[in-house]
């Protein structure tokens, strides 16, 4: 790799603000706030609003919208049956 053109990649702790879930990962983000991790080391803490622990798609609490309503209206209008 060329020297001096790549961002600093280091380990940080991401914390889901909604659930308090924390995980250690690599990132180029940095923060003034730090936290001591389970291994005893101190890492920068990045707070996120949504993670895999709170996102409805990953938790199984997903709500479906009326996207299929348009198909049902089309089928009803033209007399198609499922």
From Swiss-Prot:
PANTHER family per UniProt: 50S RIBOSOMAL PROTEIN L31, CHLOROPLASTIC, LARGE RIBOSOMAL SUBUNIT PROTEIN BL31C
Classification via SUPFAM superfamilies: L28p-like (SSF143800)
Protein's UniProt keywords contain Cell division: no
Keywords in alphabetical order: Ribonucleoprotein, Ribosomal protein
Recorded superkingdom: Bacteria
Name of the protein described by the UniProt record: Large ribosomal subunit protein bL31B
PROSITE patterns membership: RIBOSOMAL_L31
Record-level GO cellular component terms: ribonucleoprotein complex; ribosome
Cystine pairings recorded for this chain: none
Any matching Pfam family: Ribosomal_L31
Family that this chain belongs to: Belongs to the bacterial ribosomal protein bL31 family. Type B subfamily.
């Amino acid at each position: 790799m060329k020297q001096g053109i790549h961002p600093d990649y280091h380990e940080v702790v991401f914390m889901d603000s909604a659930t308090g879930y924390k995980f250690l990962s690599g990132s180029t983000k940095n923060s003034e706030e730090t936290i001591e991790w389970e291994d005893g080391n101190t890492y920068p803490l990045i707070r996120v609003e949504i993670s895999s622990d709170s996102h409805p798609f990953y938790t199984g609490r997903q709500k479906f919208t009326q996207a299929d309503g348009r198909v049902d209206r089309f089928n009803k209008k033209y007399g198609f049956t499922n």
